[in-house]
Amino acid sequence: GQCPKFHIEERDRKKLIRDIFWKHYGRYASENDFQELSSAITYIKNMMLTDEQILEIERDYTHLSKMFQAYQTALHDQHQMDFDDQMVFALKILREDAKVLNGLRQRYRYICVDEAQDTSKIQHTIIQLLAHRNNLFMVGDEDQSIYGFRAAYPKALLNFRYDYLNPYILRMERNYRSTAQIVEKAQMFISQNKGRYEKNMTSERGDGEAVQLVSVVSREAQYMYLLDIANYLKKTLPSWY
């Protein structure tokens, strides 16, 4: 069981992770160190990794398995859980308690998931349990998935046609935001990715100006270039634009 205030506060979670980092590395965790370890813990839970799979990741992140276990043990001893644990335990309950599962299925007769490319493997697993009668509508674009470091699982969109009985897949191929020049170049670039649905994107905003390729020598130079462009547009565009 959990105490009423079972959810660990972010400041306490941050201190816990920093303490664990200190014990394993013998030095203070920088903000980057904290973010990396915090993201790794989130990734493990959202991707539902086994102990063996965690050890495979450890090739790139020394002591990850031990630090993850230390983190989980500390939460357990304090009768607390983090946000990701809430999904882990929710999935456990749905799998083990048919009464709870059937009750939720009756309550949520239809399910709509927006920005589905950003959802994780454990979230898709929970959704699949709840949407057992093809009563699911998912809106997403695997081409726009940019949160892999946070365990986004766009592969679930590709598996949608296999996980559900006779699903209807609607491709939205008209772009109302960008000009044809931008859409064409973006499609040429993303088509190199083979893990996607084929699309034939078209623009509703005309041809537009040609896309320019700009080379910079560093990330800082990239930021300065973008800042210069922003300042130029601020000076030249009408105030109402």
Tell me what each language-model feature is.
Residues H7-E10, R27-F34, I54-Y61, Q80-D84, ...:
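Conserved phosphate/pyrophosphate-binding and hydrolysis machinery centered on Walker-type P-loop NTPases
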Residues L16, H132-N135, D141-D143, D163-I169, ...:
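Short glycine-/polar-rich loops that comprise or flank the Walker A/P-loop
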Residues E9, E58-N159, R174-S178:
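Conserved helicase NTPase motor core
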Residues G1-S39, K66, A70, A74, ...:
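Conserved P-loop NTPase-based nucleic-acid remodeling module centered on helicase motor cores
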Residues L165-Y168, R174-Y241:
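Helicase P-loop NTPase motor core
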Residues G1-C3, N102, K155, P167, ...:
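P-loop NTPase Walker
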Residues I17, I41, D82, D114, ...:
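Residue-level signature of catalytic and energy-coupling elements of molecular machines
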